[in-house]
């Protein structure tokens, strides 16, 4: 398989962004065993490919085990992933668990099955990680997934919450990591096409796509077309939170604010401090109708005293 210079730049960018995310969040450490969850989609293929490349030149030693969950969906091409994983030489395990039948039994016809399916799948993944001795679980969510989740939670849940690049499972036994957190979906899709990964379609279960997520995705893509770089800026905002300028009393002690306590940058109270401050304009019966907004000074007490004494003698 021959590739162009553009491909190698793309590959380098994905590896660099993944390596930076791993370093920034301490995702992988020396001696870790990482269970790499493979769905057969572009994201998980890309994640495995990038992690294998980084593993070869990393200054630490860690083990990768690829895992696919065969949920017994009708028509699932169960031969594709084992053949691919053998061809790239990674250790792997195929876990069979008939979650499909459970979902079909519990969810009414025509309703989205993704929520229950993901919960059942998560339980199997955690159990598999425990049995294999894997302390890290790698998922293929990327930057766009994280931003979409942020808006979904804000629009439909009333929370400022996204997908963390790294989190601990509820029982505290495993750490879930998202190595592609800094990577764009566009780059991942381009890489997957160039690598000719044997993609397994994600609609085998017959479930409808999450319509809310689809709408949010379309909204973000429309913003990106109008203002290139918008999604990246939103993701950067998730990494640069200023609690004092939000309204969550659990994150910032608003009730404890008082005069004489310099809690925040005063200038930032009036807006973005990176813009050059413009002179204030005044209209009216004054000598000068233009002044710089720097500070106001009161006359010294000594200068005001004679005037007060004079007034008292009259």
Curated annotation (Swiss-Prot):
Q: Name one GO cellular component term.
A: cytoplasm
Which cofactors does this protein require? Mg(2+); [4Fe-4S] cluster
Which transformation does this protein catalyse, written as a reaction? cytidine(32) in tRNA + S-sulfanyl-L-cysteinyl-[cysteine desulfurase] + AH2 + ATP = 2-thiocytidine(32) in tRNA + L-cysteinyl-[cysteine desulfurase] + A + AMP + diphosphate + H(+)
Q: Where does [4Fe-4S] cluster bind?
A: 114, 117, 205
Where, per UniProt, does this protein localize? Cytoplasm
Q: Pfam families recorded for this chain? A: ATP_bind_3
Q: Which InterPro entries match?
A: Rossmann-like_a/b/a_fold, TilS/TtcA_N, tRNA_Cyd_32_2_STrfase
Instruction: Report the pathway entry.
Output: tRNA modification
**Cofactor comment text:** Binds 1 [4Fe-4S] cluster per subunit. The cluster is chelated by three Cys residues, the fourth Fe has a free coordination site that may bind a sulfur atom transferred from the persulfide of IscS.
One GO term (biological process): tRNA thio-modification
The record's annotation in SUPFAM superfamilies points to:
Adenine nucleotide alpha hydrolases-like
UniProt lists the family membership as follows:
Belongs to the TtcA family.
Task: Quote the function comment for this protein.
Answer: Catalyzes the ATP-dependent 2-thiolation of cytidine in position 32 of tRNA, to form 2-thiocytidine (s(2)C32). The sulfur atoms are provided by the cysteine/cysteine desulfurase (IscS) system.
Name of this chain's protein: tRNA-cytidine(32) 2-sulfurtransferase
Recorded source organism is Cupriavidus necator (strain ATCC 17699 / DSM 428 / KCTC 22496 / NCIMB 10442 / H16 / Stanier 337) (Ralstonia eutropha)
Provide the taxonomic classification: Bacteria, Pseudomonadati, Pseudomonadota, Betaproteobacteria, Burkholderiales
């Amino acid at each position: 398989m021959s590739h162009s210079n553009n491909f190698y730049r793309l590959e380098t960018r994905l590896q660099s962004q993944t390596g930076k995310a791993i370093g920034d969040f301490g995702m992988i450490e020396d001696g870790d065993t990482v269970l790499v969850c493979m769905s057969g989609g572009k994201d998980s293929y890309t994640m495995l490919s990038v992690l294998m490349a980084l593993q070869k030149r990393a200054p630490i030693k860690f083990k990768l085990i690829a895992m696919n969950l065969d949920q017994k969906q009708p028509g699932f091409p169960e031969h594709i992933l084992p053949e691919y994983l053998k061809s790239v030489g990674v250790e792997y395990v195929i876990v069979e668990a008939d979650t499909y039948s459970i979902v079909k039994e519990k969810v009414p016809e025509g309703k989205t099955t993704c929520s229950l399916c993901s919960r059942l799948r998560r339980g199997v993944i955690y159990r598999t990680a425990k049995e294999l001795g894997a302390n890290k679980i790698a998922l293929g969510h990327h930057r766009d997934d994280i931003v979409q989740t942020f808006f979904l939670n804000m629009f439909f849940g009333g929370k400022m919450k996204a997908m963390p690049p790294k989190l601990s499972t509820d029982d505290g036994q495993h750490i879930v990591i998202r190595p592609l957190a800094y990577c764009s979906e566009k780059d991942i899709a381009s890489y997957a096409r160039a690598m000719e990964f044997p993609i397994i379609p994600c609609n085998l279960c017959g479930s409808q796509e999450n319509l809310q997520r689809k709408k949010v995705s379309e909204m973000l893509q429309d913003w990106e077309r109008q203002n290139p770089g918008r999604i990246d800026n939103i993701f950067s905002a998730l990494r640069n939170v200023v609690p004092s300028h939000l309204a969550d009393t659990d994150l910032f002690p608003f009730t404890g604010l008082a005069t004489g306590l310099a809690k925040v940058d005063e200038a930032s109270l009036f807006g973005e401090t990176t813009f050059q401050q413009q002179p204030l304009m005044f209209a009216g019966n004054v000598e000068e109708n233009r002044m710089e907004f720097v500070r106001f000074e009161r006359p010294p007490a000594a200068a005001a005293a004679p005037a007060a004494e004079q007034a008292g003698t009259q």
